[in-house]
Structure formats: C-alpha cells, structure tokens
C-alpha cells in the first residue's frame, strides 16, 4: 500500500484488515519522493505473561496517527494488530515541576 492509498482509505473511513494493520504499524509503505513518514514516539505497557501492549505515534505527510499492537513475548505468541489507526493532534509541551520539601535545622540552645 502506498502512503497516499493509506491516507485515502483512512479519510474514507475504510476498515483495515489485520495484514494491513501490521504493514501500517511497521510503516511498510511504498513511498514517493515527497512522502514523509516518521516514528515520533513509542511506548510499551508493562509486560503481561504472554504479551505487552505497544503504542507508536507517527507522522505521515504532516498528519499524526496513533498505531497499536499487542506484541507476543514468546516464540509461540503472535503479535496481534486489531486496533484501527487513530488520527491525533501533536504538540510538544514543556512542563515545569515544582517540588515542595520540608527542611529542618537545629536551633542552638542558649547556655
């Protein structure tokens, strides 16, 4: 599937089958020279007994998408791709965290 085919199918609200979802998650597109496809960030949930949830945020031609996979953690567990891509907004945010602590110091006693 090309990048433009993916975007067109997404915009037309077509459902992707599991094979398509795997290719999309792996960013396995046929790209033209002007296509821009990047992974922005990835996050893994805590491993469960047999699998872990993997979320990937990507930029595809200036649009941002969340992609998901349930990755098998053993050679007997397949990775499953069941969740459809979801377009998201993206912005970098700088946050400042204020920490309040208690301080104690000794008082000198008068003699």
Report residues per predicted region:
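Generic marker of "main functional regions" within proteins
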Residues: 4, 16-20, 68, 74-77, ...
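Mixed-charge, Lys/Arg-enriched low-complexity segments
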Residues: 77-111
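Negatively charged, low-complexity tracts enriched in Asp/Glu with abundant Ser/Thr
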Residues: 2-38
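Acidic, low-complexity, intrinsically disordered interaction modules
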Residues: 33-85
